[in-house]
Regions:
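Canonical tetratricopeptide repeat
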Residues: 59, 93-94, 132, 136, ...
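Register position in tetratricopeptide repeats
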Residues: 33, 66-67, 100-102, 143, ...
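N-terminal leader/linker segments that initiate helical-solenoid repeat arrays
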Residues: 17-75, 82-93, 99-103, 110-111, ...
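TPR-repeat structural position
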Residues: 37, 70, 104-106, 113, ...
Length: 329
């Protein structure tokens, strides 16, 4: 009788614990589905580690993916594959992230091709025909710089009909790295057509290849298109230099501030010129280059005199006039 009671008590406790964990899992999914990824993680942390299912691990992985926490995402991706190395939905999400990598603290992009190769080769023990897995394997070989392995992997993809942009582009880059510029030209040309000449780096590499094989006119065309797509537009560059100038002003580094303002002037619209002229005059005044400061302050006052101006320009005019008077003392 005593043994029976112990068994019943243990069973009741297990059922209660199971029900509680199911409730926690439901809560975690509820929060994740509504975009509350940190709340979902808080719920999952209530589950003992040895009770976590693969689905629990995947929910953690997805939460960290949505939060942009790459290090934690990598950790939970590895935990899932330790339990289930053939988990194809996870592999198809995880390996592209590993191939893209992350930006290190030093600002350099770090990729993990060796890990991708291990994951893909393990999966290929069961299935060697999965195009999406084989793409990531080929990409990993390329990222390692092992073009002798990347090339046959990519050619096998092409042979089974995988002629998407990524495969053609990586084939073109691989031929380029191997010095076969005619083949590189063929594949990069096909790749850029698929992207309607909108992929800047494809155009850039195609321009380089055209130069290598003596197609100067084509090289100019592709490189000009690459420049348009890779360079920020003029107003974006103007804003960037303007913000750099402001940062140098706050640091008190007016020589560098002046350089940035000169870049702004080169990119400026007419409406920006008066304010820039005043700010450059300020820099020269602080740097004790009085002749240049006076010239710019007078120019600013002349060009803004007969125009409608707001409180900011009015304040600048008063400041310029005051600084001119100071220079006369």
């Amino acid at each position: 009788m005593k043994k029976l009671l112990i068994i019943l008590f243990t069973l009741s406790f297990s059922l209660l614990a199971s029900a509680q964990m199911d409730s926690v899992r439901h809560e975690a999914r509820y929060w994740a589905e509504r975009g509350y990824f940190n709340k979902s993680l808080e719920a999952l942390r209530q589950l003992p580690y040895d009770s976590l299912t693969v689905s629990d691990l995947r929910l953690r992985y997805d939460n960290f993916a949505n939060l942009g926490n790459i290090d934690s995402l990598f950790y939970w991706g590895d935990q899932i594959l330790k339990r289930d190395p053939y988990n194809i939905p996870l592999i198809l999400d995880y390996t592209p992230r590993l191939n893209r990598g992350k930006v290190s603290d030093l600002g350099k992009r770090v990729t993990y091709p060796e890990k991708v190769i291990d994951i893909c080769q393990k999966y290929r023990e069961r299935d060697t025909t999965h195009i999406l897995v084989n793409r990531q394997l080929a990409e990993a070989y390329f990222n390692m710089g092992n073009y002798d392995l990347a090339m046959p992997a990519l050619k096998k993809l092409e042979a089974v009909g995988d002629t998407c942009f990524g495969t053609l582009y990586t084939l073109g880059l691989t031929y380029q790295r191997m010095g076969d510029y005619n083949s590189a030209y063929d594949y990069l040309s096909r790749a850029t057509v698929l992207r309607n000449d909108e992929h800047g780096w494809c155009l850039f590499n195609l321009g380089i290849v055209c130069n290598k094989i003596g197609f100067g006119a084509e090289a100019l065309s592709y490189l000009e298109m690459a420049k348009e797509r890779l360079m920020p537009d003029r107003r974006t560059l103007f804003r960037m230099h303007k913000e750099l100038a402001e940062a140098f002003r706050m640091k008190g580094e007016n020589d560098f501030r002046l350089e940035e303002l000169q870049e702004c002037m080169r990119l400026a619209d007419e409406k920006d010129v008066n304010e820039l002229t005043y700010e450059m005059g300020q820099c020269y005044f602080i740097l004790k280059q009085r002749d240049k400061a006076e010239e710019l302050f007078r120019k600013f006052l002349d060009t803004s005199e007969n125009k409608e101006y707001n409180d900011k320009i009015k304040s600048m005019r008063e400041s310029a006039q005051q600084q001119l008077r100071m220079m006369m003392w």
